[in-house]
């Protein structure tokens, strides 16, 4: 397994769970980088992007695993700069900052859980 990006959830904004339930999406952002957005995002520890995230890679959120089916054109740069992307679970999307994922259900979000992109 080749780990490409691994971070730990440090805070979950009040609207972040609503976005997951209603839009099947989670907005990730480095901890403290944009305090004005903290209510809408899942903040995480800083992480190093060791390899570009690509279609076919895997994402693990806690014990839930997903397959990357599409990577927006801005995702890898945004992750390098601000730890930012939008994860879309079992839904369609086409925005440049989105990672589209397929798997069972939606992840459980909690502080301390790892979010890991990897290649098998």
Q: Residues of each region from the PLM?
A:
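Short, well-ordered loop/turn sites that connect or cap secondary structure elements
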Residues: 52-54, 59-60, 109
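Helix-rich interaction surfaces within compact, conserved domain-sized segments
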Residues: 89-120
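Ubiquitin-like/PB1-type beta-grasp interaction modules and other compact soluble beta-rich domains
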Residues: 56-58, 79-81, 93-94
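Short, structured beta-strand/loop micro-motifs enriched in basic residues and often containing a Trp
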Residues: 36-48, 92-101
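Short, conserved beta-turn/loop elements at beta-strand boundaries and strand-helix junctions
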Residues: 64-65, 71-77
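Short, solvent-exposed secondary-structure boundary/capping segments
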Residues: 75-86
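N-terminal disorder-to-order initiation segments that are Gly/Lys/Arg-biased
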Residues: 1-40, 113-114
């Amino acid at each position: 397994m080749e780990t490409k990006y691994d971070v730990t959830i440090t805070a979950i904004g009040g609207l972040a769970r609503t976005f997951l339930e209603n839009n099947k999406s989670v907005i990730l952002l480095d901890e403290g980088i944009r305090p004005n957005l903290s209510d809408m995002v899942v903040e995480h520890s800083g992480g190093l992007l060791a390899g570009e995230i690509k279609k076919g890679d895997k994402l693990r959120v806690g014990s839930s695993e997903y397959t990357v089916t599409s990577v927006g054109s801005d995702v890898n740069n945004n992750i390098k700069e601000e730890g930012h992307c939008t994860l879309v679970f079992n839904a369609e999307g086409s925005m440049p900052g989105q990672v589209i994922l397929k798997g069972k259900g939606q992840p459980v979000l909690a502080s301390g859980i790892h979010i890991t992109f990897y290649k098998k």
